Design a protein with these regions (language model features):
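Membrane helix-loop boundary segments at the extracytoplasmic
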Residues: 17-24, 324-327, 356-394
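Hydrophobic core segments of transmembrane alpha-helices in multi-pass, intramembrane catalytic enzymes
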Residues: 27-38, 83-95, 154-170, 202-214, ...
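Transmembrane signal-anchor hairpin modules in multi-pass inner-membrane enzymes, especially those
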Residues: 1-79, 101, 105-116, 170-181, ...
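Hydrophobic transmembrane alpha-helices and their immediate junctions
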Residues: 215, 326-366
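Long extracytoplasmic/lumenal interhelical loops at the membrane interface
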Residues: 261-275, 283, 287-327
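A membrane-periplasm/extracellular boundary helix in multi-pass inner-membrane enzymes
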Residues: 218-261, 275-283, 291
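Short, aromatic-rich membrane-interface segments at the entry and exit
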Residues: 23-35, 80-83, 179-181, 202-206, ...
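Alpha-helical transmembrane segments of multi-pass inner-membrane proteins
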Residues: 12, 108-140, 151-219, 229-241, ...
Length: 409
């Protein structure tokens, strides 16, 4: 019976990585199934040892503990507090995953399941140019128009950028020439889907981030500098060839210039929030205003004719500012600790692929958090917390051996 439960748990975890890029509802159901199966299968001692050895797990638990602490001094309504507890619940769930994804076989299966899911999204994105797919979110055929299949283009671009990194790493590590060609093709098609088939400006930036991580983490010596120069030239060519990318950057520049007068645009709204949120933080710099408090407290600083509408009170489009407003320097530091622990785990692994992917994930999370609430927004938080759990498990499983000191006579 126990072996069957463990098999079901492994299947549920694999299913989670296969389906979360496409269905939040199914991912949430699998989360519940995983928790129940995790409780049934027991083996708590071994799981505790895995959690104990994983600094990413401790960082995630610390961050959620700070969210719980914020309940006791928050002026927010119970609806807002409950919303935050639910949103950040994926942090302790990630720790459950870190204790359960114990074998190399299961870890590889989970990563490959995610790659398969994103492969389906990638194929669908390209087919969307010519055919109106019934499962696609967008229904506008053609080239140089935005296409996203599930959810929103922001989250699709985040995950697609990570797929580019996976494909590039596997290109240089695959021993088979045909496999190298196939993975290189995946990286190219995924990159073009971001630059020419999406209107997400953050996606363009995140693509540059993963390319930089790949060049400076996976390559060495002359190959590294050759790739860096070639990459810069290619990005200039891409910018020149993508009308969609040029239009989006020109729009961003225009919105930035008019930010003082037009605060309802995407860029103007962010700039306005980046100005008023620090004023809120300054009132309670150490512990913040409490869990869920941003939604109501920020309204005291809003002075625009439209009032404190949902676009302002939802979140400040910056995870660092969000934690600082609700949880002060303590929450801000805990989030930095999470990012640093991911990078530290990457440095401890003996597997070059895992090292590059974990550094890339940490970089994606950090950069995306400058313009989005990465751990609060539903689809983004699914990706970052699950992948953080998986890659930290793989880094722990393949960690470098501790050098032994030879005794001298």
């Amino acid at each position: 019976m126990l072996k069957k439960s463990e098999a079901f748990l492994s299947a549920a975890i694999t299913g989670l990585f296969l389906f979360f890029p496409m269905s939040l509802g199914l991912a949430s159901s699998l989360m519940l199934a995983i928790v129940l199966l995790w409780l049934v299968t027991g083996n708590l001692k071994a799981r505790w040892l895995r959690i104990k050895a994983n600094p990413v797990a401790w960082a995630a638990l610390l961050l959620y503990a700070i969210v719980l602490l914020g309940i006791f001094y928050s002026p927010a309504s119970w609806n807002d507090i409950g919303l935050h507890l639910t949103k950040y619940l994926k942090l302790p769930f990630a720790v459950i995953l870190m204790s359960a994804i114990a074998t190399d076989k299961l870890q590889k299966r989970c990563l490959n399941a995610f790659v398969m899911a994103m492969g389906f999204v990638l194929i669908s994105t390209w087919l969307n140019i010519w055919w109106d797919l019934p499962w696609s979110k967008t229904h506008n055929q053609g080239w140089n128009v935005t296409h996203h299949v599930f959810g929103d283009y922001i989250t699709q671009n985040i995950m697609m950028a990570f797929l580019v990194l996976v494909a590039l790493v596997r290109t240089i590590r695959s021993p088979n020439t045909w496999h190298k060609i196939a993975w290189a093709a995946v990286a190219l098609l995924a990159s073009i889907s971001i630059t020419h088939l999406s209107e997400g400006r953050v996606g363009y930036v995140l693509l540059w981030v993963v390319l930089a991580v790949f060049v400076f983490s996976a390559l060495k010596g002359r190959a590294m500098w050759l790739a860096a120069v070639s990459g810069a030239v290619i990005m200039v060519v891409v910018l020149a060839s993508s009308g969609l990318m040029r239009d989006r950057f020109e729009l961003a520049f225009t919105e930035m210039q008019r930010a003082d007068a037009e605060k309802m645009t995407s860029v103007g709204n962010r700039i306005y929030l980046y100005k008023i949120t620090p004023q809120l933080i300054a009132e309670a710099p150490l512990l913040g205003h409490g869990t869920g408090s941003y939604h109501s407290e920020i309204c005291r600083f809003v002075n625009i004719p439209q009032g404190c509408h949902g676009w302002i009170s939802w979140h400040p489009h910056n995870q660092f500012l969000f934690f600082a407003a609700d949880h002060g320097a303590l929450g801000f530091a805990a989030y930095l600790f999470l990012l640093i622990s991911m990078a530290w785990m990457a440095r401890q692994t003996a597997d070059p692929e895992i090292r590059v992917l974990l550094i890339g994930l940490a970089a994606l999370l950090a950069v995306n958090s400058l313009t989005n609430a990465s751990l609060w927004s539903a689809r983004e938080s699914h990706f970052f917390t699950y992948m953080m759990a998986l890659l930290s498990c793989r880094a722990l499983y393949h960690r470098k051996p501790v050098p032994t000191v030879q005794a001298t006579a």
